[in-house]
Amino acid sequence: MSRKESRMQAFQTLFQLEMKDTELTINEAINFIKDDEPELDFDFIHWLVTGVKDHEPVLDDTIKPHLKDWSLQRLLKTDRIILRMATFELLHSDTPPKVIINEAVELAKQFSDDEHYKFINGVLSNIK
C-alpha cells in the first residue's frame, strides 16, 4: 500500500491520540488498525506517529513563526496535526518537500474545512 494511505492512517491515529478521554498508547492505537488494514506500512506509520508525538514542542516552535496572525492553539485540531506531521517529515526524511506538502494538502482537503488546504500549503511552503 502507498505512503499516501499510510500517512492518512498516521493522521487518523494522531487524531485519536489527541482525544482528551483516551489513554491509548501509540502502539495500542496502531494495533487497532492492523487487523483492518494489514497491507499498510506500519513501520512508516509508527515512525511518523512516534516522531510527531516525541518532537511536538520542537515542531510547534518550527511552525509558529509561519502562522501569521494565528496561534497554534486557535487552529483546528486537524490542521495542527497535519502541520506537525508534514513538518516532522520535512525535517526528518529524504522525501522531497514537494511530495510532503502535496500529501499534507490532500489530507487537509479530505479532513479539514473547505479552504484550509491553502493555509496548510502556505505555512509548509515557508517551512521547507
Curated annotation (Swiss-Prot):
Q: Which GO terms describe its cellular component?
A: cytosol
Its BP terms in the Gene Ontology are:
DNA-templated transcription termination; transcription antitermination
Q: Name one Pfam family in it.
A: NusB
Keywords, in A-Z order: RNA-binding, Transcription, Transcription antitermination, Transcription regulation
* GO molecular function annotations of the record: RNA binding
Asked if the record carries the keyword Glycoprotein, the reply is: no
Q: Which family does it belong to?
A: Belongs to the NusB family.
Q: What does the function comment of this entry state?
A: Involved in transcription antitermination. Required for transcription of ribosomal RNA (rRNA) genes. Binds specifically to the boxA antiterminator sequence of the ribosomal RNA (rrn) operons.
> What is the protein name stated in its UniProt record?
Transcription antitermination protein NusB
What is the scientific name of the source organism? Staphylococcus haemolyticus (strain JCSC1435)
Which gene name does the record give?
A: nusB
